[in-house]
Amino acid sequence: MNGAVCVLSALIAVFTCFSCRPAVQDERAVRIAVFVPGFRHDSPVYAMLCDGVERAVTQERATGRSIGLDIIEAGPNQALWREKLAHLAAEQRYRLIVSSNPALPHVLEPILRQFPLQRFLVLDAYAPQEHSLITFRYNQWEQAYLAGHLSALVSASAMRFANADKKIGLIAGQSYPVMTQTIIPAFLAGARAVDPAFEVDVRVVGNWYDAAKSADLARILFHEGVDVMMPICGGANQGVLAAARELGFYVSWFDDNGYARAPGYVVGSSVMEQERLAYEQTLRCIRGELPSAGAWTLGVKDGYVRFIEEDPLYLQTVPEPIRVRQSALLRRIQSGELTLPVR
């Protein structure tokens, strides 16, 4: 860690004389960097981020615009993120650096001060006080509440793998504020809206890639009576899916459409429209319409948090009475009849 700090300090010293003036750019030429704090294909969130930015760039290139795009996969070692972001900012080549992770506003704090003219867009994060930083967060209380509600409906049903225990599970990659303060309590609240007796058993992998460990944790939960589990552990999600097929339990998927990942086992997909948001905000950047700073929260009523209920695999796997109750909850949130916390 001390080495990373020294490297960052050296970078800042070298580029101090350049940090207060913008890079020279052709008015029509745009260059964008996507900073992936992990690996693109290990995480639905990062895959959607890259897909959305690429779609916007491809669309605008078709009109004759000169647009450069660099996608940098930084890996899961958070200790290196600040150093790598400082390198990008110091290059003074990018109109916008785009990323996605709740921890990034904190990581960016010294870089924003040193390079105030470099604009950053971070999705799935919230930082209302920072200059030159634009953040959008999804209302993950709504997202996790929907997932918990569906999980409890399935657990309390007569479906093949359901049991009599009032217990559902969540396997997280790591423990972090959004997980402990929003996702877990909202997941539990959604379940208890079905039956106040429900409990949530939470296990933590310790990283975002160890599928063998997540599978072991899923086996432990299964043998303790958990019949529906929600994995939020990046590439390690695959271990939970493998255990579900091996043992016979259900999976509630988070972030993107997961029904096809394990047909017959994935019973719900509570998603955030990350690809759409990345596409829209990248277009705004290219067209010169993106503000210099700001923080926004988007939820069900905005159309950026959804529960996917039209997928044929959902219709085939989940009985109609459960689908009707889940749909009724979704409509109550959409209409404003049910107001959930904004977090």
Curated annotation (Swiss-Prot):
Main subcellular location of this protein, as a coarse class: membrane
Entry-linked Gene3D superfamilies: 3.40.50.2300
InterPro entries the UniProt entry points to: BMP_lipoprotein, Peripla_BP_I, PnrA-like
Signal peptide: 1-19
Compartment(s): Cell inner membrane
Keyword terms: Cell inner membrane, Cell membrane, Lipoprotein, Membrane, Palmitate, Signal, Transport
Residues with a covalently attached lipid (N-palmitoyl cysteine): C20
Gene Ontology terms: cellular component: plasma membrane
Residue numbers with lipid attached (S-diacylglycerol cysteine): C20
Membrane topology value: Lipid-anchor
Binding site residues for riboflavin: S43, P44, V45, Y46, D124, Q140, Y176, W208, D255
Sequence similarity: Belongs to the BMP lipoprotein family.
Subunit structure: Monomer in solution. The complex is probably composed of two ATP-binding proteins (RfuB), two transmembrane proteins (RfuC and RfuD) and a solute-binding protein (RfuA).
Function: Probably part of the ABC transporter complex RfuABCD involved in riboflavin import. Binds riboflavin.
Record protein name field: ABC transporter riboflavin-binding protein RfuA
Organism for this UniProt entry: Treponema pallidum (strain Nichols)
